[in-house]
């Protein structure tokens, strides 16, 4: 009887472990691709009229704050501050643009995709994705070299961050801090704007080419994937 119980416990632990480490998969849905028009990518300095407050939960807010330029050419940057119970618990400086800030109530984690630099010659961008846990007040980098993208989202359980960097879709295991490529577009000129997961359909909005002026309408594409965990 004892051996049988130990066997059941071992099998349960094994299944949980496999589920915990198993990476999601995607399969492109043909014929769902279509053109759309977007006015901007993320939230940039030109959209910022003073302070902007983004409510995360009852105790936590994100505040976007313009930076006072010290030198000429530095007036396009702003600061992101996370306040909990009216106290600043985290801060990111020198932000050019921020994508959609996402909160997962199960894990109490926040995903913050940001752009820090745009090349003046080819308009490519470099940024990062940061993760912050509002309960434990711990931060981490999901991606330190985010290329031409602000598209990121949580999986259904809040254990993975799905995101685009350059022309590759990644799945990042937040607890183990490991990432894996799960789809490649083979289009080095694409710029990813938004990634959303709903009802096991993963939707990506992207520009097929780099865009110079993000304040005007630009032709973008929407493509969907069948998503499986």
Enumerate the predicted regions with their spans.
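Positively charged n-region of N-terminal signal peptides that target proteins for export
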Residues: 1-4
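Sec-dependent N-terminal signal peptides
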Residues: 7-9
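C-terminal motif of bacterial Sec signal peptides marking the signal peptidase cleavage site
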Residues: 13-16
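Surface-exposed loop/turn elements that mediate protein-protein interactions on large endomembrane-trafficking
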Residues: 23-44, 76-92, 123-144, 169-183, ...
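Acidic, small-residue rich beta-repeat scaffolds with periodic aromatic anchors
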Residues: 24, 55-56, 190-229
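Repeated scaffold domains used in trafficking and secretory/extracellular systems
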Residues: 48-56, 94-105, 147-154, 188-196
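Short beta-strand elements that form the blades of beta-propeller/WD-repeat-like
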Residues: 52-55, 60-72, 106-122, 158-164, ...
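Intrinsically disordered, low-complexity segments enriched in Gly and acidic/Ser/Thr residues
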Residues: 150, 154-190
């Amino acid at each position: 009887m004892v051996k049988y119980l130990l066997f059941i416990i071992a099998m349960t632990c094994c299944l949980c472990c496999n589920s915990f480490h198993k990476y999601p998969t995607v399969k492109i849905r043909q014929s769902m691709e279509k053109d759309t028009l977007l006015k901007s990518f993320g939230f940039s300095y030109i959209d910022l009229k003073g302070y902007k407050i983004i409510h995360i939960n009852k105790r936590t807010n994100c505040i976007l704050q313009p930076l006072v330029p010290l030198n000429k050419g530095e007036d396009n940057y702003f600061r992101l501050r996370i306040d909990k119970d009216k106290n600043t618990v985290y801060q990111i400086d020198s932000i050019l643009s921020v994508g959609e800030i996402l909160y997962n109530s199960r894990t109490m984690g926040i995903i913050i995709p940001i752009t820090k630099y745009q090349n003046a010659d080819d308009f490519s961008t470099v940024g990062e994705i940061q993760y912050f846990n509002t309960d434990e007040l711990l931060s981490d980098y999901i991606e330190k070299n985010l290329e031409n993208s602000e598209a990121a989202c949580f999986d259904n359980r809040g254990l993975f961050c799905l995101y685009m960097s350059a022309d590759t879709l990644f799945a990042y295991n937040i607890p183990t801090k490991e990432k894996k490529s799960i789809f490649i577009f083979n289009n080095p000129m694409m710029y990813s704007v938004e990634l959303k997961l709903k009802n096991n359909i993963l939707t990506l909005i992207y520009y097929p080419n780099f865009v110079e002026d993000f304040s005007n309408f630009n032709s973008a594409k929407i493509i969907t994937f069948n998503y499986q965990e």
